[in-house]
C-alpha cells in the first residue's frame, strides 16, 4: 500500500513556443529550477510547445521537458504544434495526442474517498486553424475513462472551455464547449487544465476547477500579463493554486475547498 501524504503537487505549464522570436531561455531555466525544487507528483503541459510545428522546434522543447524531474509528465499538442503538419513530429517525439494515465493519489479526505489520479488528455486541435474542437468521437472515451467512482479526475486539453478575461475578442473556445462541459460534469471531473491564450485564470464551475495557464517562457503576453506557470497543491481539505512568474514572483494565489470546489477560501495563511 502506498503511504499517505499531506499534499499532491501538480505543475501546469504551457505555451513554450520554442522557435519564437520572443522566446526567453532565462525564463525556461528559472522555471525548470523552481519546478524541480517542488518535486511535483504530476506535470501537465497543455500544448503549444513550438512556434510553427517544425521538428527542430519540437526537439528543442523535448530537451527542456526532459529536464523536468517528475515521474508523470503529460503533454498534449497545441494549435501551433499542428501547423505545417507538425502533429506528425509531435507524435514521433511525445507519443499519442490523446493520452490516459492513472496512478496512486494517496491524499486522504474524510468526506471524499479518492484512491487514484486519472488524467485524460485529448487533442482539441484543427490543423492549421486556431480554433479547436474536442469532437463527439471522443465523448465515449471520456465517459469510459472517467467511469471510476474513486478517482481524482483531471481533464487536459489545449483550448479553452470557458472565456478568459483579458484575451480580447474570444474566438478560440472549442466549438463544442457546452457539450464537453456537460460530459465532464456528468462524470464528475475535478480539474480541467488548459493553455492557449497566454492568460492564466481560474473558473470554479459545476463542481470543477477550470485552470488556464499562461505562457511560461515567452514575452508573447497581453497587456500587463507576465510569463507564468501554475502550482496546484491538493491537500485533504483544499486546493491551493499559485500562479508563478519564473524567477519566484507569486502573481496570484487562490484557495478552494476540496469538498466544495465552488467555495473559495480566504488567504489566511
PLM features: residue spans?
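Active-site environment of divalent metal-dependent phosphoester hydrolases
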Residues: 19-22, 51-56, 79-88, 127-130, ...
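Short acidic, glycine-rich surface-loop motifs adjacent to enzyme active sites
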Residues: 149-166
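A short C-terminal boundary segment appended to hydrolase-like catalytic domains
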Residues: 234-269
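Conserved beta-sheet core of the metallophosphoesterase superfamily
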Residues: 169-240
